[in-house]
Amino acid sequence: MKYNYLVVGSGLYGAIFAHEAKAKGKSVLVVDKRPNIAGNVYTEKQEGVNVHMYGAHIFHTNDKRVWNYITQFAEFNRFTNSPVANYKGELYSMPFNMYTFNKMWGVVTPEEAAAKIEEQKKEISGEPKNLEEQAISLVGRDIYEKLVKGYTEKQWGRDCKELPAFIIKRLPVRLTFDNNYFNALYQGIPIGGYTKMVENLLDGIEVRLNTDYLEHKAELDALADKVVYTGPIDAYFGFKLGTLEYRSVCFENETLDIPNFQGNAAVNYTDRETPWTRIIEHKWFEFGKDEDGNDLPKTIISREYSSEWKAGDEPYYPVNDEKNGQLYGKYKELADKETGVIFGGRLGEYKYYDMDTTIASVLNMCEKELG
């Protein structure tokens, strides 16, 4: 059978494109080299807990179109991301808010906190040249040293003075007692896990797992008129211009015979000495209960370690510095010449996407491609 579209990858980008193409009457084949669907949003049920197998995924967006779209495929709970920072046994609120400033300096009013931050920000004059200067210009030296520096250096594997300033803009700062990390209108976790949501997207669509597209490219290409490729763009071209760099993450999962390990879904370890960046306790994404509302007797934690990516590792975060940006630009020129192939998603576009921006991107592409 000849398909209209071959979709490479069953993560959010691939699954949504496949769903939309099928809805427009197109025939679609989805292939994925993993033994499971859903890409990095894959969740697996263990001991009644939906475990986020490729790291914590908390859906949040201000885009009503995206929210209305994705909630067709899952009911979302009211989970709100309120991580805790652990610095050598001292616990702080994340995002940086009045609880954080009170613990750090003993200040009680927003006015006092603002004055303290302003006083410490003066250390940096002019445009921040790197992440360290940017962080100090946002929250001052004390919070930078205890809550930003060690965590960020573990996450990126390099000194904060060598990292670009824009990375730290992802850390909200507020002079209120609001513990909600994301300033988003819509937020939550799909009840029953992300895998179930992706299953709903792929309902009625042929999916072949354990199928490496690049190993069987010629025979798979022959099956379809057009390809939607969501894998790494440099791998598609055999790395012939060089390898794009990523940060990778590895997880050490542990099942514990206790009901509660840390009392929160995410605890960041912000000192340099603790080897992991954070511990995720998955059951709290769904309030410690199963789908029938029963308390879960056991808990599952994941210690998360950042690492330099090497061939064979899972690529997570593109290293969007100048060198990699230029190399991606050259691959993009090659990609633009590939008639009949659409490159999309985090790996296909070498771009940091949150889930909502991935969805917005693929919906825009569907409008262009499918009408």
Task: Show where each model-derived region lies.
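Active-site/ligand-binding neighborhood in enzyme catalytic cores
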Residues: 85-92, 99-226, 230, 235-237
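N-terminal Rossmann-like FAD-binding beta1-loop-alpha1 element of flavoenzymes
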Residues: 3-30, 366
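Glycine-rich FAD pyrophosphate-binding loop
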Residues: 19-47
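A short alpha-helix-loop-beta-strand transition element characteristic
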Residues: 66-88, 143-146
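N-terminal glycine-rich dinucleotide-binding loop that anchors FAD/FMN and/or NAD(P) in oxidoreductases
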Residues: 43-69
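Short, solvent-exposed loop/turn segments at secondary-structure junctions
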Residues: 12-13, 35-37, 99, 153, ...
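C-terminal catalytic lobe of FAD-dependent flavoproteins
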Residues: 314-371
